């Protein structure tokens, strides 16, 4: 069970929830989902700038000059971490000495999982490199794939797809904003608590909708859904591409087709901002149903404070509709 508003520091709740006259920090975020969380916490006090634009790929993105200038002027960069956006780690060196970076994956309350399927407790130091190698196919193609597919090990950065992490991140965002703007600490805390309660209610809805789909295998474009499937007790998704959404080799595609046949997958889901023809080609000739496109980073969702809930609800509904059609 997710703990709702208790995640928000009680000390911060002691101040009034009305805006005070204060210098609200200039915040830059990496992806729309993080921007939505920050917007929920800031409320009417301010609006974060989101670097990754609609249709952008978080794993490989080129900043525009205007965005680089925004980074230079930012008081606070709130991002998932270099595991998701290594290009931003390099760009963040332009931040001023007075600026702060909050990597949400590094919050102590974040539940982190490895691509290899294991999980580990997050300590206070960075743990950006792991020695777990992960082979997806197990059908004799691993050696050939090693020459073509990217390395697939270390921390899975898509942690916001676990709603419990979303709640923890809201609390961490509120705490960080409050350090920069103590006069409005009560506003940030109250907004974070309200958003956390809303996520808790949505989580219960999704549990009810997804319970009938447990035990059914499905195919996705890239390996981004482990937190979601783990949280809701679903079977691990069969990923056509790896966690960085790199183009799969011919050997990997053959292995995926073998795995789909052996595992009895019933649905396949394309992904927003990626060519659906790849998914269609993988399931061609099979009886697998094609579901609605999933959008794990929220780059195709409606911008604003409601984007995170929209993303989770849309993902849960798409899975429930297709997997529950039997």
Swiss-Prot record:
Keywords: Disulfide bond, Ion transport, Metal-binding, Periplasm, Signal, Transport, Zinc, Zinc transport. InterPro entries: Bact_metal-bind_prot9 (IPR050492), ZnuA-like (IPR006127). One of its GO terms (molecular function) is metal ion binding. Disruption phenotype: No effect on growth and no effect on zinc cellular level in zinc repleted media. In zinc limited media, growth is reduced in an aztC mutant background and also in an aztC and aztD mutant background. In zinc depleted media, zinc cellular levels are reduced in an aztC mutant background and in an aztC and aztD mutant background. Disulfide bonds join 267-322. The keyword Transcription does not apply. Residues 1-22 form the signal peptide. GO terms for biological process: zinc ion transport. The keyword Cell cycle does not apply. Residues 117-155 have a biased composition (Basic and acidic residues). Transmembrane segments: none annotated. Residues 117-161 are annotated as: Disordered. It comes from the Bacteria. It is found in: Periplasm. Zn(2+) binds at residues 59, 158, 222, 295. GO terms for cellular component: periplasmic space. Part of the ATP-binding cassette (ABC) transport system ZnuABC involved in zinc import. Binds zinc with high affinity and specificity and delivers it to the membrane permease for translocation into the cytoplasm. Monomer. Belongs to the bacterial solute-binding protein 9 family. PANTHER family: HIGH-AFFINITY ZINC UPTAKE SYSTEM PROTEIN ZNUA, HIGH-AFFINITY ZINC UPTAKE SYSTEM PROTEIN ZNUA-RELATED. This is High-affinity zinc uptake system protein ZnuA. It comes from Paracoccus denitrificans (strain Pd 1222). The gene is znuA.
């Amino acid at each position: 069970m997710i703990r709702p508003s208790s995640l928000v520091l009680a000390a911060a709740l002691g101040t009034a929830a009305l805006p005070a006259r204060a210098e609200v920090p200039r915040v830059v975020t990496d992806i729309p989902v993080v921007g939505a969380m920050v917007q929920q916490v800031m409320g009417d006090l301010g609006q974060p700038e989101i670097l990754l634009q609609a249709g952008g790929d978080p794993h490989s993105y080129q900043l525009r000059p205007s965005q680089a200038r925004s980074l230079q002027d930012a008081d606070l960069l709130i991002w998932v971490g270099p595991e998701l956006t290594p290009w931003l780690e390099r760009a963040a060196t332009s931040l001023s000495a007075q600026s702060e970076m909050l990597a949400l994956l590094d919050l102590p309350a974040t539940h982190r999982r490895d691509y290899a399927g294991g999980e580990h407790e997050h300590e206070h130091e960075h743990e950006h490199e792991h020695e777990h190698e992960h082979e997806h196919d197990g059908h004799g193609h691993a050696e050939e794939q090693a020459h073509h597919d990217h390395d697939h090990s270390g921390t899975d950065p898509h942690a916001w797809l676990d709603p419990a992490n979303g709640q923890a991140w809201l609390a961490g965002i509120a705490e960080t904003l409050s350090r920069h703007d103590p006069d409005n600490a009560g506003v940030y805390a109250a907004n974070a608590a309200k958003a956390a309660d809303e996520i808790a209610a949505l989580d219960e809805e999704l549990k009810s909708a997804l319970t009938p789909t447990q035990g059914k295998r499905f195919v996705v474009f890239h390996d981004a859904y482990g937190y979601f499937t783990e949280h809701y007790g679903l079977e691990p998704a069969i990923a056509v591409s790896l966690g960085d959404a790199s183009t799969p080799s011919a050997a990997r595609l053959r292995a995926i087709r073998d795995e789909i046949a052996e595992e009895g997958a019933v649905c396949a889901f394309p992904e927003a901002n990626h060519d659906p023809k790849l998914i269609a080609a993988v399931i061609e000739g099979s009886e697998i149903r094609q579901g609605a496109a999933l959008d794990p980073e929220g780059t195709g969702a409606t911008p604003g404070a409601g984007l995170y809930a929209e993303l989770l609800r849309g993902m849960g509904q798409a899975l429930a509709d297709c997997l529950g059609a039997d």
